[in-house]
């Protein structure tokens, strides 16, 4: 559960309504793979990840980034039940994919950076603070099934 004030919730949903999920998702996942290259090991089937340009232009990275942001969008609609919303994804990433849950925090922080880049002055410190709460809540929910 994420505790947002009504103002924070409005800020999050208002900005999210302007997000191009295809573009932002691919950029966020791509930046994660470039900035934290050890995360690439989970994406062996994605082909060429040999350089920042290859990662950022990789269609599989873009497609998976869109999928990730689709799940994030779903979470925004269920802020009162993030653990339930992300239960299956948590189990998948824990039991089958063996993803270090710290990576969820990294991706959340990268997403905040990408949003700041895309929205500039509209991404005020108050909006950032609200999004930091949301990405922390999502990361916590995704780590929930870990032992």
UniProtKB/Swiss-Prot annotation:
InterPro entries reported in the protein's UniProt record: Globin, Globin-like_sf, Globin/Proto, Hemoglobin_b, Hemoglobin_oxygen_transport
Cellular component aspect of the GO annotation: blood microparticle; haptoglobin-hemoglobin complex; hemoglobin complex
Binding site for heme b: 64, 93
The keyword Metal-binding is assigned to this record: yes
S-nitrosocysteine sites (modified residues): 94
Modified residues (Phosphoserine): 45
Domain of life: Eukaryota
Modified positions (N-acetylvaline) in chain numbering: 2
Record has Iron as a keyword: yes
Pfam families for this protein: Globin (PF00042)
Tissue distribution: Red blood cells.
Modified residues (N6-acetyllysine): 60, 83, 145
Family stated for the protein in its record: Belongs to the globin family.
Functional description taken from the UniProt entry: Involved in oxygen transport from the lung to the various peripheral tissues.
Subunit details: Heterotetramer of two alpha chains and two beta chains.
Protein name from the UniProt record: Hemoglobin subunit beta
Organism: Papio anubis (Olive baboon)
Upper taxonomic lineage: Eukaryota, Metazoa, Chordata, Craniata, Vertebrata
